Design a protein with these regions (language model features):
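Accessory terminal alpha-helical modules
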Residues: 1-187
Length: 187
């Protein structure tokens, strides 16, 4: 029979090297939920690890968020917010996600916004940063925002878009770029 070490692989290797006896427990009934719970005591799981555990379990909506993350190169936390129609992620959303109760409600809108972020990335290398994504999602939600106007301004004035310290600073930077008027030469 094949045996697998679920937790403590590195500890086992270290004990082998120094010749210390190893205590172990053999269980045939371990489930991925048990492993997740076991590991959360020793080391915090990343959102990607939670995602993959739910994908393996076949939890609805998780295979779609996995596709979204891989297709658009957007991090898990930002993808959760986008796919639920938010401009930022909350602890409540993240807990719901970890517990396998994530529901995707805004795939079409999130995909449209992700395509726009991809387009922005051509002109601004930090377009995939968390602060920028949360800022641009807030801007996209503004009814008076015109995408074509913005991308035209960005393509002609990309040097005006710079790394910012916060989401709010990015919103101010985006607004300045959006309202930027070309300098008129007076002769």
């Amino acid at each position: 029979k094949n045996w697998y070490i679920i937790d403590g692989q590195h500890r086992l290797e270290a004990y082998k090297i120094v010749g210390v006896p190893v205590r172990y427990l053999i269980r045939d009934d371990m489930k991925i939920e048990d492993i997740r719970s076991l590991n959360s005591v020793h080391m915090k799981w990343s959102l990607m690890e939670y995602l993959m555990s739910h994908v393996k379990l076949g939890t609805p909506d998780y295979k779609y968020i996995e596709w979204f993350i891989r297709h658009y190169s957007i991090q898990v936390k930002e993808s959760i917010a986008m796919l639920q129609g938010f401009h930022y992620s909350t602890n409540e959303q993240l807990d719901t996600f970890k517990n396998g109760k994530f529901k995707m409600t805004h795939l079409e809108e999130a995909s449209k916004y992700a395509e726009r972020i991809r387009e922005i990335h051509k002109y601004f290398e930090y377009a995939y940063s968390k602060k920028f994504i949360y800022a641009i999602l807030s801007v996209f939600a503004n009814k008076s925002f015109k995408w074509k106007h913005f991308i035209d301004k960005l393509s002609k004035n990309s040097s005006k878009m710079r790394v910012q310290a916060s989401r709010v600073d990015y919103i101010v930077c985006i607004e300045r770029l959006y309202k930027h008027a070309p300098i008129i030469a007076v002769g």
